[in-house]
């Protein structure tokens, strides 16, 4: 009965409005898609055409076409709450496994389709939707703005965690698998749309992306910044490409004829949708941003004429005026609208459900145990063992006492990273919980010890308000301020011990509270438990008012970047005096601004300088100490970057204090980027890079720490020794950046990663030592490398092949061109077989403004990391 019910509902939900079925030729599935698109296009008014060229596409009620929101996210799982959360892409990249990435994103798209199947697409709310409505993502649809295939050129960039690292080849091959997994392998329909973003040359600094210009050399453009985009277009048939915020060669990317027409359309033959990042068109004319256009009309017309099909925003509404003034022809709009309409037909939005291959995917797929198992396995494969002195790891499960300390140990939100969804409650487990579950007979001493990046201990007092109930929070959805005149009843109230509200996540500010016209009042009585300065920190998108005993302590009118929002910046604390035993009535009032997102976060607390003396004495009874630290997506993400790459000072202090105990110290680093450990080198016995591992991270980490899984991950980025190794963040030249151009000595190299077992890499062979330039599908040569597991446990080793062009000063020092992951039992030998095709020998040719195979002498290097000591080589010639 259950199976029949799901399928029956699905058939109803996939169809367009019943009042419009079988009325028009565009609904006739016996016609070609091109014929159907042309028929639908012919029935639309100019205003309707414009309304369909924006992210929140209007409904065409007379034709039975519901509104559609093109914006959904699936960076490492469907972003909304209740879906499986996999490791961040930077962690998936560390697995060096094309199959793993494909399998993960096949599950992601399954969950997306299952959600689409259970959604009522004839809901009256989807009709009578005019132009200019709010376009924030709500219920996920079928078009997902992933993957991010920008090059992680600088470890300070906040969004590097969304990418597959610093190497163009690795980004390309894993990006291709992401797209194939998302879009499915059906010949007639796409399961979902993937989107290659942010096209192109986009990697921070985040605060400047709406106003900056980048002008890389043509060589860097073609050899570093474009290869992944080219691969997604030509090898994966990606159906959406997002143009980036910044200017490229003086023009906003969304008006760059070179990027969008010359390269994307003409050179690569791209035939699908180009869309903007959200509010990117506004940047063209907003004061203090690009200021390349005088107004929204000129910006919109220019964007469309130069290759942009769909806007995330509302500025394209002005295209109706452009039509009337003759600034743009309706036939031009038709050229662009054809692509977006074709996209909806290709997704099966206008076809009966029984025609679609995924109609049987029901809600049971979403956050299933099968998907949780995949998320856990992906997390295992993502972890990279960087140090293991004296084989401290794996830890014995028979240890009597283990100390677990550090700011990330018991933080469940940490696991999700940037652009992460929220797993179901049964899949929410902290890393600390995973350790406890793995060794139930072991005594665990736990202390948070410190905050991520703060040398002061914070004593929180929100829970002490209102006689221990916490602060009272009242929520309104009202166009009028509820703080002036007669106060309407709030839509929701509750007592809270934390202030952390935003329109991100499953419920927005709170369940039952709309994201529109939000107003919040926080209030309570506090009886002071000390005499001194009570600290507070507040940050919001639109300011706030703080009152104590009826007096305004601070009125923040908003504007500018919210303070205290992490991203490597120090939280700003202010204060008001308190006296022990006295009562203080505190009120905070906030209203949502007009920006893209809403946010109100804060705390009321004491601040004391940290001292680890007592902690060090306490953990001396432990047999081993596990520090779970690093950073979190609160310190790196969209909108903000890390200020530096050093391990935060307070954690340096913690590491040194734990090392002073004489006990084995294992440091588990959680981050989406490279962290410099030079300041504490030699102060830890083992170092494990865990990234942001998703909902399976707790079990995965425990499996690795206690030997149930042998780590085999490899770094997809370079771990530098200090900030001094980094060029200017604003400089988009690749000189001295990433392993391909870095002339210094890294702390941990790209491609590096240890195991609990040992491997011997034998002498490799090549099927050919030279090749002739010419058109051929055959590889130029195949590298065959024997690998033997010489240790005592099963493990994986990844053979990597790099190419170096000799006699070319501007070429990379070496560049990854192939890899193969081998799983070997003790004593077993297998061969890695890695083909090098013509693309492995392509470099920029200014005569054709494109990549081309270059004749000359090459070195083919193979081994287990990018370090010279781990590589052997062949000579190779291209004639």
Describe each model-derived feature in a short phrase:
Residues 1-23:
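Bacterial Sec-dependent N-terminal signal peptides
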């Amino acid at each position: 009965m259950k199976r029949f019910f799901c399928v029956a509902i699905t058939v109803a939900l996939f169809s367009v409005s019943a009042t419009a079925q079988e009325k028009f030729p565009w609904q006739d599935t016996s016609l070609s898609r091109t014929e159907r698109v042309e028929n639908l296009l012919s029935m639309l008014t100019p205003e309707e055409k414009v309304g369909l060229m924006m992210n929140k596409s209007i409904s065409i009620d007379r034709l039975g076409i519901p509104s559609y929101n093109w914006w959904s996210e699936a960076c490492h799982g469907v972003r909304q709450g209740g879906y499986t959360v996999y490791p961040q892409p930077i962690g998936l990249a560390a697995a060096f496994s094309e199959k793993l990435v494909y399998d993960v994103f096949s599950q992601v798209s399954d969950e997306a389709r299952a959600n689409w199947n259970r959604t009522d697409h004839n809901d009256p709310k989807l009709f009578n939707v005019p132009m200019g409505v709010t376009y924030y993502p709500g219920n996920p649809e079928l078009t997902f703005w992933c993957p991010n295939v920008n090059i992680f050129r600088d470890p300070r960039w906040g969004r590097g965690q969304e990418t597959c690292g610093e190497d163009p080849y690795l980004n390309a091959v894993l990006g291709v698998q992401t797209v194939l997994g998302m879009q499915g392998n059906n010949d007639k329909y796409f399961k979902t749309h993937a989107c290659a973003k942010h096209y192109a040359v986009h990697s921070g600094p985040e605060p400047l992306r709406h106003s900056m210009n980048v002008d890389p050399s043509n060589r860097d453009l073609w050899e570093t910044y474009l290869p992944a985009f080219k691969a997604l277009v030509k090898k994966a048939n990606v159906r959406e490409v997002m143009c980036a915020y910044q200017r490229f060669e003086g023009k906003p990317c969304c008006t760059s004829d070179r990027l969008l027409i010359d390269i994307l359309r003409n050179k690569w033959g791209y035939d699908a949708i180009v869309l903007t990042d959200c509010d990117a068109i506004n940047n063209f004319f907003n004061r203090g941003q690009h200021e390349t256009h005088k107004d929204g009309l000129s910006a919109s017309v220019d964007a469309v004429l130069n290759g942009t099909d769909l806007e995330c925003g509302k500025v394209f509404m002005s295209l109706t005026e452009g039509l009337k003034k003759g600034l743009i022809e309706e036939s031009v709009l038709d050229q662009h609208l054809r692509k977006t309409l074709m996209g909806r037909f290709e997704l099966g939005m206008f076809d009966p459900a029984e025609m679609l291959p995924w109609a049987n995917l029901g809600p049971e797929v979403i956050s299933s145990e099968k998907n949780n198992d995949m998320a856990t396995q992906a997390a295992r494969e993502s972890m990279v063992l960087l140090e293991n002195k004296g084989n401290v790891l794996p830890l014995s499960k028979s240890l009597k006492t283990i100390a677990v300390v550090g700011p990330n140990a018991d933080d469940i939100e940490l696991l999700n990273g940037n652009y992460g969804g929220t797993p179901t409650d049964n899949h929410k487990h902290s890393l600390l919980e995973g350790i406890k579950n793995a060794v139930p007979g072991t005594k665990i001493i736990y202390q948070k010890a410190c905050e991520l990046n703060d040398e002061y201990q914070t004593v929180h007092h929100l829970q002490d308000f209102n006689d221990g109930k916490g602060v009272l929070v009242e929520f309104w959805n009202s166009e009028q301020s509820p703080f002036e005149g007669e106060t309407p009843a709030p839509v929701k109230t509750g007592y809270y011990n934390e202030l952390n509200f935003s329109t991100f996540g499953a419920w927005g500010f709170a369940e039952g509270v709309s994201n529109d016209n939000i107003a919040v009042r926080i209030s309570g009585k506090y009886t002071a438990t000390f005499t001194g300065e009570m600290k507070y920190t507040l940050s919001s998108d639109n300011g706030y008012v703080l009152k104590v005993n009826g007096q305004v302590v601070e009125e923040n009118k908003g504007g500018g970047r919210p303070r205290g929002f992490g991203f490597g910046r120090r939280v700003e604390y202010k204060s008001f005096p308190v006296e022990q035993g006295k009562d203080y009535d505190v009120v905070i009032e906030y209203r949502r601004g007009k920006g893209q997102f809403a946010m109100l976060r804060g705390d009321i607390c004491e601040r004391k300088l940290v001292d680890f003396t007592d902690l060090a004495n306490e953990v001396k009874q432990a047999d081993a100490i596990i520090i779970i630290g690093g950073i979190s997506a609160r310190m790196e993400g969209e909108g903000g970057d890390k200020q530096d790459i050093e391990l935060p000072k307070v954690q340096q202090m913690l590491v040194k204090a734990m090392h002073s105990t004489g006990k084995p110290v294992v440091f588990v680093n959680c981050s989406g980027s490279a962290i410099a450990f030079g300041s504490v080198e030699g102060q830890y016995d083992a170092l494990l890079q865990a990234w942001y591992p998703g909902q399976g991270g707790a079990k995965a980490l425990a499996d690795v720490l206690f030997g149930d899984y042998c780590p085999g991950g490899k770094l997809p980025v370079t771990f530098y020794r200090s900030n001094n190794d980094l060029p200017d963040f604003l400089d988009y030249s690749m000189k001295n950046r990433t392993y391909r151009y870095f002339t210094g000595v890294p702390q941990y190299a790209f491609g590096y990663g240890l195991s609990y077992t040992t491997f011997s890499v034998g002498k490799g062979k090549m099927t050919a030592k030279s090749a002739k330039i010419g058109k051929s599908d055959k590889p130029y040569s195949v590298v065959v490398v024997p690998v033997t597991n010489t240790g005592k446990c099963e493990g994986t080793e990844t053979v990597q092949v790099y190419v170096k062009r000799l006699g070319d000063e501007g070429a990379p020092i070496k560049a990854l061109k192939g890899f193969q992951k081998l799983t070997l039992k003790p004593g077993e030998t297998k061969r890695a077989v890695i083909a090098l095709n013509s693309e492995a020998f392509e470099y920029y040719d200014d005569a054709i403004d494109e990549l081309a195979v270059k004749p000359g002498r090459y070195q083919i290097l193979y081994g287990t990391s990018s370090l010279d000591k781990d590589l052997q080589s062949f000579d190779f010639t291209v004639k």
